[in-house]
């Protein structure tokens, strides 16, 4: 097996037993693929597929004017280039987007000609606003902040059948309903009422009998009955009737007279119920007709109108119940044939017939009018209006679209074979739905499960953007239609017709403020990846929190391998926001698919198929862990399988598919929890969620016990620098890596240099620090997609969210009561959990009515000391240490004349003093913050003079760019001259560059010449001369290219910034704040074991083992049994073994043992104890030494979920590390020196520091701001608010009779305005008395009573 650059340096011991059939797919594919599909950026006109933007344009265009004399057609579109790259957009606070230019064609027809001859054609490109681009990591930069569009899980379009679970009617009768849900357009519902009539609702309005809809579609009563019922035919024979017999229809009826066969043998006696046995006998006897008395048809319903044979008079309409009166008429008129509907109470109810009876309409027009009245109550209906409204509802492609998915689901559900068809409904569709609904009511067929993932589909970014875009285009269409009529007469161009504002606004609104466009969770790489893989049932067109019941939130059998059953938030959103499973993807219709291996005749193949929830239902699917022999055959007599959404066992021959991996059930976050299979589900949920809140520590530390997914997450998250192409590292420093690309990967005519600029100390969305550190050294060889630099929370290309801590499970002095955590001071000293947080503070200078604000160091009434960290422009120096209240940017604002006191006016009059015209509005460091200034950015409006600071920042940025380009040129030049050297050496020169004719060119000769002189050489061979000329042209060309590139970037830097109206200048100051761990911070393991640091003890007081090694963390053992997350104990044991092995290797390295010994010991670790074998023989001795060096801190282990280390393997590892197999040790109390009475579990657990830091939460108020109306103090830390003294707290003081405390709580400390100002003055004067007055809330109450029209006054004595 081939190891990558970083894998070679540190191999993770893998305990997995099952083979890797399929790698985990690229984790951000769901976002990137969807948006790529939407934009189709590289496609030419002919390559456009009918999706995304192209589909949106095609659905709205061509736009035809009202008169039909002009049309605007869509030809194609192209995307421009972004003005700034991603980093610049974040810095400048702008959107990373490209201009969209659409080519449209205006066609004007000749009014006079009969066949609409074309009079004029104009084509033009029209600008249609900006389309945000997705960055390569699946995010969008909108107004300078990174956002993620979360995918939405919504109900698939199509038809669904359901019942009300007996909740509507008191009898508990099941009322069935059908609903046709389009992708866009009106919903159509059919439902039964308790009397078994069928009703229809359009868009959940008032219900009408379903037959009204059928009549509106043009069906007559007879046609409706014909479609839904079969008929019984009776021939009239004098006083009796002869029934054309279909024996099956008699089942369950009571014979009204003896039924005999031809020979007179009685088959059924009179009064007996006819059973299946009787029917068989009747069929055998071959009886075709049955004589019945005339009253046999009483109460039956006519299927066709009964007509007088002579006069043509209608004796009974169709769908009429036959009674004695009608029968008498029939007998009198000598009618020969009667047709009645065949219905029974078992499987053929009279529902449609009954519905027709309650229907008041009798023809199509009346039905249309009835529907018009229901949709538009109060408007007078006309025939045209009624027809238009009805046609627009379901039959017009502009108003109604089932979409390809909807049509496919619709046809499948009603039992058709073809899956493609029109996007609008037709008559047959509606009848088919009604038939299916009636069948279900008759007991044939079952209702749908709406929580089945075959009935819910995922809407990704691309699709939602397309919908928004279409909304914008439809708005444009209305305006264009009106202007098109002018275009005919006035000769306008397409540009003049189209106003792109509505499109731009719709797109901007979607990306900026849609519920699904979320501020990216950027705590650490895992939280980024999880956020992009999130699937939400909320959002526009989805559910709302309040209305979502238990069923929607619950885990469904179809979630298996598609949606993670573990990772979902706790709280009101539980089950509504889910995470994609590790291997899941969406298919072309948007349904989630999971991969499976194909199994043929109990033989497992390596062929992989992706199936959606519907497709997999009929398969018999074995678990990934099913036992196989060497040939890949299933060997167990019975295999545990999933079939029809149930878990069961089957014989191996019946198995058709098998899971690809045990971790395909869970999401990325859950698959990072080692020994997940030993944790309770609730705790696993917390563990998954808390990993996303881990703050990146100062020095990342890989987990000793991982799952092997760490590398995938780090690689796919995009926080690491990954080699785009293989090559050799040319130079590397802290901020950039330069790679000379390998010759076989260089494309012709390009430089063959890859420069990677690393991100240094940048702020993330959550104010944590993003910093990249190079892993490679000069001269190293790297392959494509090797990791060259670590990002935040990554260590050698593996995700590293926390730190490995030596922990002991023991109760100790009550310091770990109720999940508290006791830490050793060493953890603080070694900066194990020190994190860096970066805050961005912004100062904006605006143009006010009284004049412009000014950024300056000349601030009134501020001492020298406060200004010593500012430069002459009034902006703080980079590197300055600042604390709360320090000035970062000096700014003064013009002050209005009105605020002058008489004394000031006098002074102004005497001295003509102008200094007090301005007030100090400087940017200061907020309370409770202290840190170091690490960066300053100045943005200046066009036309405003730039200050010295802005110019110096610009100069340093230009130097950086110049350095990059020079580096690139240097390598290009070097490579070119190397190639020339190898071509020229050993050949003869003709002269030039001071050489004699026929002189042989050697390395010495070339070294003696300057590079410029090489091109003056004339060689004997023409081919070499040509090569020299080409090389010279190439180098000149590259130089020019790079100079152009530099000029372009320089222009961008020097142009003014596009600031909001009224803003002259923006200064952004970035502060780096260092936070050590302290009591009150929240920490957690990966198993949902969270707690708050209660105390930090000196190292010497901590419990230590026989060697004197103190533990770092003491955890409470009582936190384990009741919570059932035993995974943490196993992790602790295996962590101890990992550390022990590392120490053993460390001793071997320090004793400078032979490489062969190291090799043997490493082989013992990796290849002798369970799990996957590693190919150590392919390593050179130097690589073995490098590996051993990196393992000295501990041998990292991987125990994948559901396929991890067994207890016996953990014991074997402990034994190999010369540690007790119990994992327990005798500890000594550091305070007393006494041994503890029993052995204690000690080991290494991976601990995370969560982003719930006490510094951000601790808060106290002295005086501060007050609410305007009630005059009470505000609440919350952000407003510098106070603590609420609520109703119950007042009761407490009342109960204790603490009258004075209560009085000041309700008056001077709250809303007695005069009392509190007076008290403040008194305290300043050293007088501690108070005089409570009238609370402001009393005045508010009086005003509220007056607002109700009641005059109320307070009578004062």
Swiss-Prot record:
GO terms for molecular function: DNA binding; DNA-directed RNA polymerase activity; ribonucleoside binding. Its EC number is 2.7.7.6. PROSITE patterns: RNA_POL_BETA (PS01166). Disulfide bonds: none annotated. GO terms for cellular component: DNA-directed RNA polymerase complex. This is DNA-directed RNA polymerase subunit beta. DNA-dependent RNA polymerase catalyzes the transcription of DNA into RNA using the four ribonucleoside triphosphates as substrates. It is an enzyme of class 2 (transferase). NCBIfam families: PRK00405.1 (NF001616), rpoB (TIGR02013). GO terms for biological process: DNA-templated transcription. Belongs to the RNA polymerase beta chain family. The keyword Transcription applies. The keyword Transcription applies. The RNAP catalytic core consists of 2 alpha, 1 beta, 1 beta' and 1 omega subunit. When a sigma factor is associated with the core the holoenzyme is formed, which can initiate transcription. Keywords: DNA-directed RNA polymerase, Nucleotidyltransferase, Transcription, Transferase. It comes from the Bacteria. It comes from Pseudomonas fluorescens (strain ATCC BAA-477 / NRRL B-23932 / Pf-5). It catalyses: RNA(n) + a ribonucleoside 5'-triphosphate = RNA(n+1) + diphosphate.
């Amino acid at each position: 097996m081939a190891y990558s650059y970083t894998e070679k340096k540190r191999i993770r011991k893998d305990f997995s037993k099952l083979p890797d059939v399929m790698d985990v797919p690229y984790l951000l594919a769901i976002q990137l693929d969807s948006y790529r599909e939407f934009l189709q950026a590289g496609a030419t006109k002919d390559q456009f597929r009918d999706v995304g933007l192209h589909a949106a344009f095609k659905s709205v265009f061509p736009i035809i004017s009202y008169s039909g004399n002009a049309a605007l057609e869509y030809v194609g579109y192209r995307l421009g280039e972004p003005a700034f790259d991603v980093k610049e957009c974040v810095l400048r606070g702008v959107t990373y987007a490209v201009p969209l230019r659409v080519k449209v064609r205006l066609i004007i027809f000749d009014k006079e000609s009969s066949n609409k001859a074309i009079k004029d054609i104009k084509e033009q490109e029209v600008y249609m606003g900006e389309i945000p681009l997705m960055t390569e990591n699946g995010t969008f930069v909108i107004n300078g902040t990174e956002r993620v569009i979360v995918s939405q899980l919504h109900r698939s379009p199509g038809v669904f059948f359901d019942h009300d679970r007996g909740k509507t009617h008191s009898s508990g009768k099941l009322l069935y309903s059908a609903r046709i849900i389009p992708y866009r357009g009106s919903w159509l519902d059919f439902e039964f009422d308790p009397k078994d009539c069928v009703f229809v609702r359009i868009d959940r309005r008032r219900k009408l009998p379903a037959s009204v809809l059928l009549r509106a579609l043009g069906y007559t009563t007879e046609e409706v009955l014909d479609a839904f019922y079969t008929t019984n035919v009776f021939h009239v024979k004098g006083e009796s009737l002869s029934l054309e017999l279909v024996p099956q229809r008699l089942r369950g009826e009571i014979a009204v007279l003896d039924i005999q066969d031809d020979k007179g043998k009685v088959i059924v006696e009179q009064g007996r119920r006819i059973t299946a046995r009787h029917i068989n006998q009747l069929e055998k006897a071959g009886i075709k007709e049955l004589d019945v008395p005339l009253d046999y048809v009483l109460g039956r319903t006519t299927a066709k109108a009964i007509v007088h044979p002579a006069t043509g008079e209608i004796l009974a309409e169709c769908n009429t119940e036959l009674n004695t009166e009608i029968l008498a008429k029939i007998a009198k008129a000598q009618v020969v044939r009667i047709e009645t509907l065949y219905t029974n109470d078992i499987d053929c109810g009279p529902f449609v017939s009954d519905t027709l009876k309650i229907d008041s309409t009798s023809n199509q027009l009346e039905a249309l009018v009835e529907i018009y009245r229901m949709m538009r109550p109060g408007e007078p209906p006309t025939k045209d209006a009624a027809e238009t409204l009805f046609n627009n509802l379901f039959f017009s492609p502009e108003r109604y679209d089932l979409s390809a998915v909807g049509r496919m689901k619709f046809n499948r559900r009603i039992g058709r074979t073809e899956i493609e068809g029109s996007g609008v409904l037709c008559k047959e569709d509606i009848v088919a739905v009604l038939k299916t609904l009636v069948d279900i009511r008759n007991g044939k067929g079952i209702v749908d499960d709406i929580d089945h993932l075959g009935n819910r589909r995922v809407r990704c970014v691309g699709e939602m953007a397309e919908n928004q875009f279409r909304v914008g285009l439809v708005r444009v269409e209305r305006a264009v239609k009106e202007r098109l009529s002018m275009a005919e007469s006035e000769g306008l161009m397409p540009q003049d017709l189209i106003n792109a504002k509505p499109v731009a606004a719709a797109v901007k609104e979607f990306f900026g403020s849609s519920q699904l466009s979320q501020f990216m969770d950027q705590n650490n790489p895992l939280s980024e990846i999880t956020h992009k893989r999130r699937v939400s049932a909320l959002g526009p067109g989805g559910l709302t929190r309040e209305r979502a019941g238990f069923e929607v939130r619950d885990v469904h059998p179809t979630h298996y391998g598609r949606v993670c059953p573990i990772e979902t938030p706790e709280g009101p959103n539980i089950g509504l926001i889910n995470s994609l499973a590790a291997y899941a993807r969406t298919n072309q219709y948007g349904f989630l698919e999971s991969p499976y291996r194909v199994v043929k005749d109990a033989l497992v193949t390596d062929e992989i198929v992706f199936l959606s929830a519907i497709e997999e239902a009929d398969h018999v699917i074995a678990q990934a862990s099913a036992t196989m022999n060497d040939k890949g055959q299933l060997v167990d007599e019975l295999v545990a399988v999933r079939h029809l959404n149930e878990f069961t066992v089957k014989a191996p021959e019946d198995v058709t598919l098998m899971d690809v991996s045990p971790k395909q059930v869970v999401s990325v976050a859950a698959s990072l929890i080692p020994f997940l299979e030993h944790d309770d589900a609730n705790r696993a949920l917390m563990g998954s969620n808390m990993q996303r809140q881990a703050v990146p520590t100062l020095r990342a530390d890989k987990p000793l016990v991982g799952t092997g997914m760490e590398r995938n997450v780090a690689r796919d998250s995009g926080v690491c620098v990954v080699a785009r192409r293989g090559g050799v590292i040319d130079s590397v420093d802290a901020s950039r890596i330069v790679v000379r690309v390998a010759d076989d990967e260089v494309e012709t005519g390009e430089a063959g240099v890859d420069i990677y600029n690393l991100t240094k100390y940048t702020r993330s969305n959550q104010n944590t620090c993003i910093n990249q550190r190079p892993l490679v050294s000069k001269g190293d060889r790297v392959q494509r997609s090797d990791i060259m630099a670590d990002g935040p929370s990554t260590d050698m290309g593996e995700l590293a969210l926390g730190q490995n801590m030596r922990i002991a499970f023991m109760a100790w002095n009550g310091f770990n009561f109720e999940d508290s955590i006791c830490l050793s001071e060493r953890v603080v000293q070694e900066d194990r959990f020190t994190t860096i947080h970066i805050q961005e503070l912004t100062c904006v200078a605006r143009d006010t009515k009284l004049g412009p604000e000014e950024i300056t160091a000349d601030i009134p009434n501020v001492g020298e000391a406060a200004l010593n960290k500012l430069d002459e422009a009034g902006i703080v120096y980079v590197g300055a240490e600042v604390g709360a209240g320090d000035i970062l940017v000096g700014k003064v604002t013009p002050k209005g004349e009105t605020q002058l006191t008489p004394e000031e006016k006098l002074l102004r009059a005497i001295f003509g003093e102008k200094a007090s015209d301005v007030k100090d509005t400087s940017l200061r460091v907020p309370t409770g913050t202290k840190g170091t200034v690490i960066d300053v950015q100045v943005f200046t409006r066009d036309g405003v003079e730039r200050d010295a600071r802005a110019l110096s920042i610009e100069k340093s940025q230009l130097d950086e760019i110049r350095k990059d380009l020079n580096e690139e040129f240097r390598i290009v030049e070097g490579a070119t001259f190397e190639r020339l050297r190898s071509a020229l050496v050993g050949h003869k020169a003709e002269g030039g560059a001071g050489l004699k004719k026929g002189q042989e060119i050697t390395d010495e000769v070339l070294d003696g010449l300057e590079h410029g002189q090489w091109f003056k050489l004339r060689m004997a061979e023409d081919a070499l001369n040509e090569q020299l000329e080409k090389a010279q042209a190439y180098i000149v060309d590259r130089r020019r290219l790079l100079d152009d590139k530099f000029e372009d970037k320089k222009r961008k830097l020097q142009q003014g910034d596009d600031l909001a109206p009224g803003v002259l200048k923006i200064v952004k100051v970035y502060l780096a704040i260092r936070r050590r761990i302290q009591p009150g911070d929240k920490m957690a393991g990966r198993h949902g074991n969270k707690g708050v640091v209660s105390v930090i003890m000196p190292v010497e007081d901590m419990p230590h083992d026989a060697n004197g090694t103190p533990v770092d963390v003491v955890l409470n053992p009582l936190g384990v049994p009741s919570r059932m997350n035993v995974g943490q104990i196993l992790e602790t044991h295996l962590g101890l073994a990992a550390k022990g092995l590392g120490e053993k290797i460390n001793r071997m390295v320090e004793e400078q043992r032979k490489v062969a010994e190291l090799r043997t010991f490493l082989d013992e670790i990796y290849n002798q104890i369970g799990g996957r074998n590693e190919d150590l023989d392919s390593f050179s001795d130097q690589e073995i030494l490098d590996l051993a060096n990196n393992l000295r801190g501990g041998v990292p282990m991987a125990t994948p979920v559901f396929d991890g280390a067994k207890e016996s393997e953990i014991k074997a590892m402990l034994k190999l590390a010369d540690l007790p197999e119990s994992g327990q040790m005798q500890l000594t109390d550091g305070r007393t020196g006494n041994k503890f009475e029993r052995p204690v579990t000690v080991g290494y657990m991976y601990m995370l520091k969560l982003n719930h830091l006490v510094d951000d939460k601790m808060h106290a108020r002295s005086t501060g701001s007050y609410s305007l109306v009630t005059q009470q103090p505000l609440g919350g830390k952000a407003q510098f608010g106070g603590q609420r003294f609520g109703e119950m707290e007042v009761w407490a003081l009342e109960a204790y009779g603490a009258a004075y405390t209560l009085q000041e709580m309700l008056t001077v400390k709250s809303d007695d305005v005069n009392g509190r100002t007076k008290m403040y003055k008194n305290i300043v004067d050293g007088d501690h008395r108070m005089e409570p007055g009238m609370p402001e809330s009393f005045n508010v109450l009086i005003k509220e009573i007056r607002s109700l029209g009641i005059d109320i006054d307070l009578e004062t004595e």
